Regions:
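Non-catalytic cap/lid and distal C-terminal segments of serine-dependent acyl enzymes
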Residues: 1-345
Length: 345
């Protein structure tokens, strides 16, 4: 017996689930699993038109997210998976939508290759993209492939096309990490104070405590988890040593390490990757006006960086909406639908 809404909903398209065995993630420094879930959504009509090919939109998650988060319903709203299916069921231009898992034991990977976390950029670009193109009827070129995400996923949605314009021709970033001195630096004193008062200045002591109390958070956890995870992605030495960008005793910046972080800021990357950005067919940028990490300011800075390198205004959709950092899943269907339309043949 099928359950009625909200517990069950009839799908117009289909969701295909895979367990992907990644060679790139095998032997990663955190010993995280190299077998990862992968969801591929095919839109209504996919099975009825066996020769038709579709643009694809890749959806990547924020910090601490795993791919099954897209199944989560709220009391008065469907899941993201269901919302996107409903969007295409309404007759909007169709696309294949791919949901990627790039979680790590530190919470995330920023979708980069790093000796601190593993080769998540390679995994996404050089393993998953060819796999999906081989097994589904995508339009297998950058002009018809986009990527979307929120927060750290929004960061990945910005930097992945910058690094691989041969693979991605469009992006949608919702409150993506950008303008690092605004979104990250305010947490450095908080993290330093928490380390001093609770862990004798030791991140190792924090991690031991954090992992010993699953589901029992402390107020200081978010800043400590976030900054250490980011350091693992942005400023890990080749031997695996994670370098923090601030002094754990004072919270003051360590300039040479901080410069390594800034080199990964999408706002700053724009000037050296101008050709890649000018080649994108569609760029969606949004954020809530009350974002707790000031990513509305980062969104504006990224928009201005695009303009400064000559990205055509008609390729960019920019919006600041009433909202904060959380609870903005309602932005996904329209943004993914916009990419699907812009990336269609």
């Amino acid at each position: 017996m099928d359950l009625p809404p909200p517990w069950g909903r009839a799908w117009a398209g289909r969701l295909h689930e895979h367990a992907f065995d990644s060679q790139a993630l095998t032997g990663n420094p955190l010993s995280d699993s190299h077998v990862r879930p992968l969801y591929v959504y095919t839109p209504p009509g996919y099975d009825d038109e066996p020769h038709r090919r579709y643009p694809s939109v890749w959806v990547i998650q924020g910090m601490t997210g795993q791919v099954d988060m897209w199944r989560n319903r709220k009391a008065f709203s469907p899941s993201v998976l269901e919302s996107i299916d409903a969007w295409f069921a309404d007759g909007h231009p169709p696309a294949i939508v791919v949901y990627v898992d790039a979680w790590t034991s530190y919470g995330g990977s920023q979708f980069l290759d790093s000796p601190g976390t593993g080769r998540y950029h390679t995994y996404l670009c050089d393993e998953l993209v060819p796999f999906v193109d081989e097994h589904y009827r995508t339009l297998p070129d950058a002009a018809h492939r986009g990527i979307a995400g929120k927060s750290s996923g929004g960061y990945g949605a910005m930097v992945t096309p910058i690094l691989r314009p041969d693979l991605f021709g469009g992006l949608a970033t919702h409150a993506g990490d950008a303008l690092f001195e605004i979104c990250y630096q305010p947490e450095f004193p908080q993290a330093a104070r928490a380390l001093r008062d609770e862990y004798d200045g030791s991140f190792d002591a924090f991690w031991a405590d954090f992992r010993a109390r699953p589901g029992r958070p402390k107020r200081s956890d978010p800043a400590l988890v976030n900054e250490y995870a980011m350091a693992a992605c942005y400023s890990t030495d080749a031997d695996g040593t994670i370098r923090l960008p601030f002094d754990v005793g004072t919270g003051q910046l360590i300039p040479d390490v901080w410069d390594r972080w800034l080199a990964w800021d999408p706002v700053r990357m724009a000037s050296s990757r101008a050709d890649a950005l000018r080649g994108l067919r569609a760029i969606w940028i949004d954020a809530g006006r009350s974002d707790e990490y000031f990513l509305d300011l980062g969104a504006e800075a990224f928009r201005r960086a695009l303009a400064s390198v000559g990205v055509d205004d008609d390729r960019v959709r920019f919006e600041l909406f009433d909202g904060a950092h959380g609870g903005i899943e309602w932005r996904y269907p329209e943004a993914i639908g916009w990419l699907a339309e812009r990336l269609a043949p």
